[in-house]
C-alpha cells in the first residue's frame, strides 16, 4: 500500500492493482549489487517471480489455505512435486527448515559474503491449522477468557517495565470493515465478529473461541 501496489481504501482506482511501480525496486536489487546473497522463505505477495527479483534461493508458499499440504508451492520458482513432500509436512516447519538450509549452505559455501534473508511465515493466518500435539499443549490455557488473559499479560508487561500506561478498554463496536455472513454460518454459532466481554459469550462460544486461541498459539 505504501507504494500503491495494493488496494487503497477510499482512493478511487484502488492503487496499482497488484503491480509494483517501476520507481519502487526491492531492497534485494541494491543488496545484490553490493555482493549480498539473497534468500526467501515463505509468502511472496509481490508481483513477478522470486529469482527474477534478485534472490538466489526461494521457497514460495502459495498454498495458504492448507498448512498440511505443499501443493502449489514453488522451490526456486519451479513447482514443488508431491513426491518431494516430507512426512508430516507442516507449512511453518517447512518454511523454517528451508531458511535454516539456506543459511547453513551460505556459511559453508559463501562465508565471505553478507546475506539477506526474507522469512515470511503464513502463520498465524486463517485457516487456523496446527499439529494436534502442539494444540494439546495450549488446550485449556484460554478457557479463562480473553479478559483475564489480557489483564495478566498487561500486569506482566508493567512489572518488567515495558509499559507505563493503563489497560485499554474493549471496543465492542470495532470489527472488520466488512461482513462475512457466509463464513459465520459455516463456522457455526460459536463464532463472533466483535470483541465483546468474555462473560457475554455463551458456553458454546467460550469453548469455540478458547479452541481458536489455542490453535493460534500452537501455530
Model regions: which residues?
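Formylglycine-dependent sulfatase
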Residues: 1-219
Amino acid at each position: 500500500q505504501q507504494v500503491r501496489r495494493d488496494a487503497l481504501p477510499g482512493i478511487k482506482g484502488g492503487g496499482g492493482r497488484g503491480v509494483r511501480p517501476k520507481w519502487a525496486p526491492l531492497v534485494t536489487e541494491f543488496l545484490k549489487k553490493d555482493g549480498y546473497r539473497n534468500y526467501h522463505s515463505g509468502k511472496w505477495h509481490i508481483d513477478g517471480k522470486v529469482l527474477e527479483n534478485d534472490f538466489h534461493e526461494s521457497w514460495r508458499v502459495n498454498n495458504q489455505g492448507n498448512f498440511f499440504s505443499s501443493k502449489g508451492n514453488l522451490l526456486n520458482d519451479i513447482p514443488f512435486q508431491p513426491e518431494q513432500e516430507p512426512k508430516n509436512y507442516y507449512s511453518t516447519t517447512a518454511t523454517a527448515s528451508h531458511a535454516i538450509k539456506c543459511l547453513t549452505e551460505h556459511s559453508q559455501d559463501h562465508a565471505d559474503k553478507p546475506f539477506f534473508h526474507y522469512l515470511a511465515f503464513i502463520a498465524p493466518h486463517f485457516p487456523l491449522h496446527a499439529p494436534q500435539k502442539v494444540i494439546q499443549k495450549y488446550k485449556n490455557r484460554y478457557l479463562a477468557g480473553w479478559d483475564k488473559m489480557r489483564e495478566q499479560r498487561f500486569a506482566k508487561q508493567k512489572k518488567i517495565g515495558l509499559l507505563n500506561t493503563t489497560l485499554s478498554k474493549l471496543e465492542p463496536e470495532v470489527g472488520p470493515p466488512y461482513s462475512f455472513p457466509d463464513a459465520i454460518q459455516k463456522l457455526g454459532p460459536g463464532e463472533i465478529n466483535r470483541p465483546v466481554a468474555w462473560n457475554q459469550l455463551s458456553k458454546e462460544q467460550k469453548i469455540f473461541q478458547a479452541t481458536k486461541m489455542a490453535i493460534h498459539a500452537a501455530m
